[in-house]
């Protein structure tokens, strides 16, 4: 097929014009991403000239160049000025690190903690400016939430409240739904959903006035059925849906809502081995005899060891999550969802596009590889035949002496 040079030249002229405008505005990221984009555009140019008529080639090349330069634009950030932000759960992890970064940027930070004299609160007092204010708050106590609302109003009379970061979260069991006490589900919902809901609703008048931001820490466990995290995951799923509702309803008020869905990061609470050991012992101590007989203590020990093994993959650098929270607060056009962390793109692709059996096996291999409960193992007294489960289970008859080994 004869090649037409004019669509190529016209498209490249449009791309060059936009690139020049972005350069003059200091709104174009230079370096390898730009070189890669130009190489891909050159390859697309050759394909378009070979396969498409002139008008279609011009349209495709111009659109591709426009999209590429849009992706390479520097994110437009709002000035910090005198903005104030309330962050919950600043005793450790994402909340503490976000409070430190926003304080260093010049924000007025209102940070809630469970313990005013705990290590996290002491660290924030030592390394942050006097602008940072600490408040003790337990999201399961309505009186604490009411006090936090009054505290926030009192400390933002001159600046207004620009943002709320719903970071505080709770999970204290890693076990099958049948083994998890109903109280665990209630506790997760109280902190991760109802407490955050009450606080958010109470702050909406201030956020209406500032046309500010709501940023909420979610979890992929709220979108994918992670093994043994049902109590935590259901509360995070409820919170994510609530934020989607807020996003639609608050749009006329100019309030923007973002949900951060982080991967596996090594926060203090997640990597606290002694805490998880205590929770396992408490679960075993309160397990009804019938369930203890059906599942076996070695089954729970296996889940515990698998969970601790999965934590070895946790990322120690929390900055991707902190950066995502910062962008959601200051970007001119914040994203509705942020996915900081390694491998999340692959996980979501598998979850949404591959068959259910493959999805389940992938999550198990990534997080907790299950074994059969005692009552389903061949050779056990009163064992229940389970041909379907045995066929799907990668480890149907584990040797108790090797439970948790890899």
UniProtKB/Swiss-Prot annotation:
Its main location: other. It catalyses: an 11beta-hydroxysteroid + NAD(+) = an 11-oxosteroid + NADH + H(+); corticosterone + NAD(+) = 11-dehydrocorticosterone + NADH + H(+); cortisol + NAD(+) = cortisone + NADH + H(+); 11beta,17beta-dihydroxyandrost-4-ene-3-one + NAD(+) = 17beta-hydroxyandrost-4-ene-3,11-dione + NADH + H(+). Residues 379-406 are annotated as: Disordered. Inhibited by carbenoloxone. Highly expressed in the kidney. One of its GO terms (molecular function) is 11-beta-hydroxysteroid dehydrogenase (NAD+) activity. Its EC number is 1.1.1.-. It holds the Pfam family adh_short. Disulfide bonds: none annotated. The keyword Endoplasmic reticulum applies. Transmembrane segments: none annotated. The active site is at residue 232. It is an enzyme of class 1 (oxidoreductase). Keywords: Endoplasmic reticulum, Lipid metabolism, Microsome, NAD, Oxidoreductase, Steroid metabolism. Substrate binds at residue 219. NAD(+) binds at residues 82-111. Catalyzes the conversion of biologically active 11beta-hydroxyglucocorticoids (11beta-hydroxysteroid) such as corticosterone, to inactive 11-ketoglucocorticoids (11-oxosteroid) such as 11-dehydrocorticosterone, in the presence of NAD(+). Functions as a dehydrogenase (oxidase), thereby decreasing the concentration of active glucocorticoids, thus protecting the nonselective mineralocorticoid receptor from occupation by glucocorticoids. Plays an important role in maintaining glucocorticoids balance during preimplantation and protects the fetus from excessive maternal corticosterone exposure. This is 11-beta-hydroxysteroid dehydrogenase type 2. It comes from Oryctolagus cuniculus. The gene is HSD11B2.
